[in-house]
Amino acid sequence: LKSLGIEFDLFSEEQRLYENGAIDNVLKRLEELSLSYKKDGATWFKTTSLGKEEDKVLVKSTGEPTYRLPDIAYHIDKVHRGFDLIVDIFGADHIDTYPDVLLGLEALGIKTDHIKVIIHQFVTLKKGDEVVKMSTRKANFITLDDLVDQLGVDVVRYFFIMRGANS
C-alpha cells in the first residue's frame, strides 16, 4: 500500500487480541449477558435474542474462531483508543458477518453510529480476454505489489478509482 501513497499510523495484529485477553473478555461478557451458549462443541452468539432469525457461531467446534469474534474484540479496542470515526473496508466475503459484529458491539453497550462499513467487491483481472481465477487457498493470486510492478502506480490507482466499491 505504501507504493500507492497509503500509510498506516498503527498496524494491529490479531494475535495481540488473544495475548492481551480481549478475545476471552468478549466471550466472558457475552456469556454474562446470556448471549452465548455451547452447542455441538461450538460457542454460539445468541443473535436470536437480539432480533435475528438464527444464532451465529463465534468459535467452531475445532476451537477456531469465526471472523465475528476477533472483529468484535478489535472494534472494542478501537473504540477504547478514542477514535471518533472508524471506517471498515471489507471484502464481499464478509457481507454476512459484519452486521453480527455491529450487533455484538451494541449488545456489549458500545455505540456503532461512528462505524462506517464499506463492502468492496472482489477485483477481477483479465489476461487477454480470459478472466483469471483467483484463490488464496490454492495460492493463485496477484498481490498489489505485483500489479504496481507490472502496470505502474498511476495505472493501478486509475483502475481502482474508476469503479465504486460495489462494482
Please place each PLM-identified region on the residue numbering.
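A contiguous, basic/glycine-rich beta-loop/short-helix subdomain that forms a polymer-engagement track
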Residues: 20-80, 105
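Generic, ordered loop/turn and secondary-structure boundary motif
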Residues: 7-9, 18-19, 46, 58-59, ...
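A glycine-rich phosphate-binding loop feature that marks nucleotide/adenosyl-phosphate handling sites
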Residues: 14-20, 43-50, 118-126, 163-166
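Conserved alpha/beta enzyme-core scaffolds, especially Rossmann-like or related mixed alpha/beta domains
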Residues: 1-29, 37-40, 78-91, 113-121
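A general marker of short, structured functional hotspots
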Residues: 7, 14, 71, 94, ...
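Catalytic adenosine-cofactor/nucleotide-binding cores of aminoacyl-tRNA synthetases and other
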Residues: 75, 79-167
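Residue-level signal for pocket-adjacent positions within structured domains
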Residues: 6, 12-13, 53, 129, ...
